[in-house]
Amino acid sequence: MTMTDIALVVLIALALAYAIYDEFIMDKLKGKTRLLVPLKRMNRLDTLIFIGLVGILIYQNVMSNGAIITTYLLISLAFMACYLAYIRRPKLLFKSTGFFYANIFIPYSRIKNMNLSEDGILVIDLEKRRLLIQVTQLDDLEKIYKFMIDNQ
């Protein structure tokens, strides 16, 4: 195995670990999920460019009679990128003591202010940071509001 193959295996393993954490583990952390809200997908064009570049690498590897394992690893990397960007749904998980946003748990005590922008983006101000949450359906903003009021 070359250094390139090792790097590809590490990248694929990290992407797979992230996908497993996001899909199965995060739901079970920090207690029962009280509300799950699907979010808008972001960076689709970036992933399409990345998959195109990986496709160029696959073509280059096949045309130069490169190692077959490298080709399979590049194909696997392209499939993982496709899954993470187009199949997996980003979500906002509300728990009893906080919520998961971008796979990071944020306790409710860190929230300093909440606002709703004109274009339907929920803005949550934390101590040092501002979260911009874009939901897929505007009705979900009402669910979030009701959940936050009921649990304060």
Curated annotation (Swiss-Prot):
The chain crosses the membrane at residues 6-26, 45-65, 67-87. The keyword Cell membrane applies. GO terms for cellular component: plasma membrane. Keywords: Cell inner membrane, Cell membrane, Membrane, Transmembrane, Transmembrane helix. Its main location: membrane. The keyword Membrane applies. It holds the Pfam family DUF986. It is a multi-pass membrane protein. It is found in: Cell inner membrane. It comes from the Bacteria. Belongs to the UPF0266 family. This is UPF0266 membrane protein ECA2388. The lineage of its organism: Bacteria, Pseudomonadati, Pseudomonadota, Gammaproteobacteria, Enterobacterales.
